[in-house]
Amino acid sequence: MKIGIYKDTFANNRGADIAVKNLATGLSERAHAVTLFDKSEFAAKVRGEYDVIVSTGTNEILDLAKVDGLPPIVQQFHTDPNYPFRHWIKRWRRNRAIKAALKKAAAFQVLREAHIEILQKLIGVSKERITVIGNWSSFEGRAKIRTEEKIILCPGAINADKNQSLLVDAFAAVTAEFPDWQVHIYGKGKAKEEAALKKKIDSYALRDKIVLKGYVDLEEPYRRCAFVAFPSKTEGFGMVIVDAAVFSKPTLMIHDWIGCGEVADPRDFALALRRLMSDVDFRRDLGESSRIYCSANYSREKILDEWEALLSEV
């Protein structure tokens, strides 16, 4: 099969960027002719001889909808389908254009069962045109047994949505009980957002306990940590959870992502931190259960099988 995959930019190396690259590589390794192209290559490559085109986001479908004569388009959602429309009043013209463009897609891929009904309400698409397919971890097959250290790992870009400030507040509430523990935050953000997070850390005099590590490959940090804390407000799937599961590490997160993160109480998060920090057997049981579940439901081979089935049907 000849497959075009359009992603406007890979500049940020976010979870969605990684998932798209993984998909392109995986399908290529299964003998499909895959062309992955970005905004700079759009004019030259959009009219290639494809059997199907995968649109990887709402920016992408806006571009593709302007081109006539394209093959069937499969639209991806890397987040809750509501999320791109969160600024309805501020961006009403753009949002209206996105909805019109989405209706030109032949099929849709979402990350969770809960997203099906949301997408149906947004654009009136039938359930039969929506398929749930998750993501697999780039670390699959690379895990090794390591003795855990008293480190809480928090990966993700530093910004309000990733909500690292909630973790800082919660850890500050329990750190006196666990003097040997540290929080390692991996990720980068805008200078203003990084400065605000550092200021909050300094307000608790915890710079020696809460360490900003910047952006690095996370394989070794996952191996070393005791567990992962992921206080993000908005996620479609949360690749961090699947990544952590590869290493049998549990993930502490907010129960639901859209909206709940806005009102999450640091005291509740602190209670959960305390539970995990104080009980190594509990951590390991959760981590192993997560590994078993994710390996059964989000393996590379299973997800590629699901993608091949979807692409062959449109």
Task: Please describe what each predicted stretch is.
Residues 90-108:
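Membrane-proximal helix-turn-helix segments that form the acceptor-binding/catalytic region
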Residues 17-22, 150, 154-173:
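A conserved mid-protein helix/loop that constitutes part of the nucleotide-sugar donor-binding site
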Residues 55-60, 76-78:
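Short His-centered aromatic/hydrophobic patch
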Residues 155, 182-196:
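Glycosyltransferase donor-sugar binding loop
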Residues 196-214:
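Nucleotide-activated donor-binding/catalytic signature segment of Leloir-type glycosyltransferases, i.e.
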Residues 114, 136:
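Carbohydrate-associated surface elements
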Residues 233:
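Aromatic "clamp/platform" in nucleotide-sugar-dependent glycosyltransferases that forms part
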